[in-house]
């Protein structure tokens, strides 16, 4: 939410938001790793969410993969003039949905994570609005 507000009120902030998103992904991976070392298994919300070693390991893999995707895609986005503030925010929303799905123990929590992830991926599929194939891909994906 902070990144969206920053992008609205500060002009030409796509580079700042991109770097802050990379920092957020790394910080979340470090926090997930540190919190996992001291705790065995934690349940939240009446055992709807379970946090254990396996889920933390999968979250760290997801976070590092998103970090790599954001790092690699910056040059592509700059080349095709698609370097906008929405891209890293959509990636972060998708990663949040993945992390919810990883820790879910109930079907409704899994579905909430799936919807959060898929909504961000719908928008990412149609990110290049000027191309016909991008609009077609988003329509077919939806």
Give the residues covered by each predicted segment.
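Alpha-helical transmembrane segments of multi-pass membrane proteins predominantly involved
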Residues: 1-142
